């Protein structure tokens, strides 16, 4: 029964509103779960009971059969409607911690293909430990209770691969019906801690995006006095890199949202243009009006429950008007960053499998956010990448936080990048284990010792430990706490010690070092620094470089972004991420797009609370 879909499509078309239709596979109906209860996903907590959305087993053949049927039926019904410009695959797809029969059987088959000889599997994964050795494939144990990080991380990688396959499967069906002018997209999301927090552990965004024409994303974040723009920045940097050279769609972001998110005046505009400044070509809200029942009753939309106009809706109308007016200048913006940050789902899995001390949760994302946010606050604009290859040579600086698990090829490419003139800021635990989470038997940081010029064999937890500067360029008296982990570093001959531990037992060891390697330079940090110290280390590493990514001499809460538009002009965004007015001077000559006035270098500018300006030069 497509009555409501037809009604909405006709209303949108009559109003001149374009439509993206989503495949309806992320929430199974009650009758289907009752008829085929095996389609409900099994996790370590057991088979899920019907109620929430996204509790289906995406590799279950019965679920796939019904999913294909509804996709094809829907597509055949609406494919020619003139309002439709594109198709969204599913919704924030993940594997939902699936450990069910079909997932585990598929995993074992994948290992059989990779390891015709079980002895090699046992060797690579170290399965002799605690008698975990597997001598016959039919003896392969359930994966969910394994004590072996190599096996657990391999299964996690396989689970992510099934998300990639599932989205590609849907895309192939949709493209059988899609018109030539219609695109295929998907709304990726991130690790959730009440808002978008970090790299998504359950999806390989870079692999899954290959099935799409345009990458899409959902970004939610703290608001009111806690609004920083950091989530918009990292979310945009990841999504911008999924389809290189293309812009992306913000398919969901908050309008009013939760009660604690109700935006202060001006914040909705600030958020929307921050998305544009990261490379978004669309900003759309979840959702239009606030719903009156069920789980998301208090996840409010642009309109409140009374459907009447309100300040958030009114502010959104100004955003739409400015988007329409300024599209010639702001459409198809491109980043020209020369700083990149490397992320890895495999390193995340491995690092989180061995939590130090009393650490809990996804510490990889804590580390990622510490490095990203430090540079964001420092007005260093960056791209986020997932590999180092020939394309990486266009970046002058590479940030490598927590690359705990990596094959020798990736680490060698990092060394080669440095040798050819690159600068690298490499974080603790990088290079420690191979791609199978087997710790390297060489001096650490393994292959990276060659470029970093430092080694260690011991490490501990930084209890009552600070660091002190060994060079005039660093003043860490206000940011001297060593956190989470500390490696007892010994510099090679010719390697400079930048920081040293302040502790009665560990004072002889370096905490951060810098070494020349080939034509480049590597800075290695053996602990988790505070944000202010990370920015100082970055400045030391890049002191003699003029970086396009260094967008301003100002610091957070004045956030400055720079993009290139299709006319070849620079677009400078100056965002005041604070509740107080800010007086600055212009760092560029150009035209203020919102007012049309000419702005001169050195001209005083006042930005009210949560206000921004855009200058074309």
Q: Could you describe each region identified by the protein language model?
A:
Residues 1-45, 170-178:
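Aromatic-lined substrate-binding rim segments of carbohydrate-active enzymes
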Residues 1-13, 69, 162-169, 230-234, ...:
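Aromatic- and glycine-enriched glycan-recognition loops and surfaces
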Residues 11-14, 78-79, 205-210, 238-244:
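Acidic (Asp/Glu)-rich catalytic clusters
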Residues 22-31, 85-94, 187-192, 252-254, ...:
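Short, solvent-exposed turn/loop segments enriched in Gly/Ser/Thr/Pro and often Arg
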Residues 34-37, 41-232:
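Polysaccharide-binding and catalytic clefts of secreted carbohydrate-active enzymes
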């Amino acid at each position: 029964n497509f009555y409501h879909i037809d009604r909405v499509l006709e209303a949108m078309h009559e109003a001149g509103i374009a439509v993206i239709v989503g495949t309806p596979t992320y929430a199974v109906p009650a009758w289907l779960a009752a008829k085929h209860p095996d389609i409900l996903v099994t996790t370590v907590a057991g088979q899920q009971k019907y109620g929430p959305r996204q509790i289906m087993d995406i590799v279950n053949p019965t679920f796939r059969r019904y999913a294909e049927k509804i996709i094809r039926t829907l597509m055949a019904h609406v494919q020619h409607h003139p309002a439709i410009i594109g198709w969204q695959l599913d919704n924030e797809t993940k594997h939902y911690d699936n450990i069910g029969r079909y997932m585990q059987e598929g995993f074992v088959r994948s290992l059989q293909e990779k390891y015709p000889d079980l002895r090699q599997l046992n060797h690579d994964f170290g399965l002799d430990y605690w008698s975990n050795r597997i001598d016959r494939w039919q003896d392969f144990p359930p994966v969910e209770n394994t004590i072996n990080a190599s096996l657990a991380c391999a299964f996690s990688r396989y689970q992510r691969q099934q998300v990639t396959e599932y989205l590609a499967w849907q895309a192939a069906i949709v493209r059988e019906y899609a018109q030539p002018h219609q695109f295929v997209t998907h709304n990726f999301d991130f690790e959730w801690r009440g808002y978008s927090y970090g790299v998504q552990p359950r999806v390989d965004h870079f692999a899954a995006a290959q099935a799409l024409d345009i990458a899409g994303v959902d970004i939610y974040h703290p608001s009111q006095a806690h609004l920083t723009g950091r989530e918009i920045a990292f979310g945009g940097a990841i999504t911008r890199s999924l389809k290189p050279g293309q812009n992306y769609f913000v398919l969901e972001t908050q309008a009013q949202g939760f009660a604690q998110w109700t935006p202060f005046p001006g914040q909705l505009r600030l958020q929307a243009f921050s998305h544009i400044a990261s490379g978004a070509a669309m900003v759309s809200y979840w959702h239009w009006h606030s719903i009156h029942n069920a789980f998301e009753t208090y996840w409010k939309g642009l309109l409140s429950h009374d459907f009447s106009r309100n300040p958030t809706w009114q502010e959104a109308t100004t955003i739409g008007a400015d988007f329409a007016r300024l599209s010639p200048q702001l459409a198809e913006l491109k980043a020209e960053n020369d700083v990149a940050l490397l992320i890895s789902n495999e390193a995340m899995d491995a690092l989180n499998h061995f939590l130090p001390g009393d650490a809990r949760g996804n510490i990889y994302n804590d580390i990622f956010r510490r490095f990203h946010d430090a540079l964001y606050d420092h007005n260093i604009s960056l791209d986020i990448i997932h590999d180092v290859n020939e394309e990486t040579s266009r970046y002058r600086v590479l940030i490598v936080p927590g690359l705990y698990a990596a094959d020798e090829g990736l680490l060698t490419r990092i060394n080669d990048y440095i040798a050819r003139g690159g600068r690298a800021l490499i974080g603790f635990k990088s290079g420690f284990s191979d791609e199978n989470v087997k710790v390297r038997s060489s001096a650490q940081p393994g292959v990276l010792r060659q470029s970093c010029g430092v080694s260690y064999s011991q490490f501990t937890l930084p209890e009552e430990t600070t660091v002190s500067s060994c060079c005039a360029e660093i003043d860490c008296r206000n940011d001297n706490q060593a956190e989470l982990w500390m490696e007892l570093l010994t510099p090679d001959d010719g390697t400079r010690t930048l920081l040293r531990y302040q502790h009665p037992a560990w004072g002889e060891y370096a905490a951060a070092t810098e070494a020349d390697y080939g034509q480049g330079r590597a800075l290695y940090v053996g602990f988790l620094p505070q944000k202010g110290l990370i920015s100082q280390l970055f400045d030391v590493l890049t002191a003699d470089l003029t970086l396009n990514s260094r967008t301003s001499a100002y610091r957070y809460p004045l956030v400055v972004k720079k993009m290139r538009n299709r006319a070849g002009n620079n677009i400078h965004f100056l965002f005041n991420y604070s509740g107080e007015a800010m007086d600055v001077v212009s760092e560029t000559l150009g035209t203020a797009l919102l007012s049309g006035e000419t702005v001169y270098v050195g001209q005083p500018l006042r930005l009210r609370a949560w206000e921004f300006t855009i200058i074309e030069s």
